[in-house]
From Swiss-Prot:
This is Peroxisomal membrane protein import receptor PEX19. Residues 1-26, 39-66, 109-141, 293-312, 318-341 are annotated as: Disordered. Required for proper post-translational import and stabilization of peroxisomal membrane proteins (PMPs). Acts as a cytosolic import receptor for PMPs and delivers them to the docking factor PEX3 at the peroxisomal membrane for subsequent insertion into the membrane. Acts as a chaperone in stabilizing or maintaining PMPs in the lipid bilayer. Directs PEX17, a peripheral component of the peroxisomal matrix protein translocation machinery, to peroxisomes. Stabilizes VPS1, a protein required for peroxisomal fission, at the peroxisomal membrane. The gene is PEX19. Residues 113-141 have a biased composition (Polar residues). PANTHER family: PEROXISOMAL BIOGENESIS FACTOR 19. Residues 1-18 have a biased composition (Acidic residues). It is a lipid-anchor. The keyword Zinc-finger does not apply. The keyword Zinc does not apply. Induction: By oleic acid (at protein level). GO terms for molecular function: peroxisome membrane targeting sequence binding.
């Protein structure tokens, strides 16, 4: 055994011989001597750990790129859908934008803040979705909402495209389309039954009421005012250019009467106290007389007297009498036709 080993054993013996009460007094010096190196190493490790945690927290507070992209898509889809529905939805659009902003802020919450707010989040702090500042459930909600919005937007676009094609193919204006739609609704409602199989089983007199309502709509100011006003203006131009021509001499009296009737109808619609119920009988009489006078020299596309099968059918409907015995056959034909559809 060499000299150093003896020295070590001597130190050990001295330590064991010491009074235990004095160990506490010597322990600080021993710690300072034996563990100062370890202490400095621990400090360096702790500093590195803090720096790492700071970077992690900073990363956690950043937005999830995937979620951010979903938010932008969600906002764009909603904006497109609102365009198809008109300007009256501006308020809804603003509210939706506020909701998007709130969701974006929620997605930015770092994990440390979430852990401080809820013990349940502490237990799930290692979850991948939480580390990214959001959880998978939150992403799923945004994703599902975006899918629904896209689906609804596609339905709106398809519906608008079909309506545009139908309008171009039929050559009818929106007013007439609305009338025909309301017309069908009235005939369906007149059945008085909720069953789809029996809704066209019309009772006696109900078809008469439906046709009366149809005629009332066709003679309404909403439908006829603009076409009649345009026709009156074109009549004035026509008389200035053709009133003295010999070729129109035989019919010039008829044309003047037509002009007077159109002018009277327009004047009725422009009355300050105009009332649909009050003036509809007079308007109907004038339209009947106008139809009986025959063709007009006016060829306006919006003219109620334009030539063609559509106008002839309209005028025939205006001639229908509620007491006409043939009305019963019309009732049966319409009912059978609706059932077949």
């Amino acid at each position: 055994m060499n000299e150093n080993e003896y020295d070590n054993f001597d130190d050990l013996d001295d330590l064991l011989d010491e009074d235990p009460t004095k160990l506490d007094e010597q322990s600080p010096m021993m710690c300072k001597r034996r563990f100062c190196v370890h202490d400095s190493e621990n400090k360096e490790k702790n500093a590195e750990s803090k720096d790492s945690d700071g970077v992690q927290v900073a990363n956690e507070s950043e937005e999830d790129p995937e979620l951010k992209e979903m938010m932008v898509d969600l906002q764009n889809e909603f904006a497109n859908l609102m365009k198809n529905n008109g300007n009256e939805n501006n308020v809804k659009t603003e509210d939706f934008n506020k909701l998007i902003s709130a969701l974006e802020e929620a997605a930015k919450v770092p994990r440390q803040q979430m852990e401080q707010g809820s013990s349940s989040l502490k237990s799930n702090s290692t979850d991948k979705g939480t580390l990214n500042g959001s959880n998978p459930g939150f992403k799923n909600i945004v994703s599902n909402t975006l899918d629904r919005l896209k689906e609804n937007g596609n339905k709106v676009d398809t519906s608008l495209a079909e309506e545009t094609k139908e309008s171009q193919r039929s050559g009818q204006n929106n007013n007439i389309d609305d009338i025909l739609s309301q017309l069908l609704d009235q005939m369906v409602a007149s059945g008085g039954k909720e069953s789809a199989e029996n809704q066209f089983d019309l009772k006696d007199g109900e078809m008469d009421d439906a046709i009366t309502k149809i005629l009332d709509q066709m003679t309404s100011k909403e439908v006829l005012y603009e076409p009649m006003k345009e026709m009156r203006s074109e009549f004035g131009v026509w008389f200035q250019e053709n009133g003295e021509n010999e070729e129109h001499k035989e019919k010039i009296g008829t044309y003047k009467r037509q002009f007077n009737i159109v002018d009277e109808i327009v004047n009725i619609y422009e009355l300050k106290d105009y009332d649909e119920l009050k003036h509809k009988d007079r308007v109907t009489e004038l339209l009947d007389e106008l139809e009986q006078l025959g063709d007009s020299p006016i060829r306006s596309a919006n003219s109620p007297l334009k030539h063609g099968n559509e106008e002839e059918e309209l005028m025939k409907m205006l001639e229908i009498d509620g007491n006409d015995p043939n009305l019963g056959n019309l009732d049966k034909e319409l009912t059978d036709g609706c059932k077949q559809q």
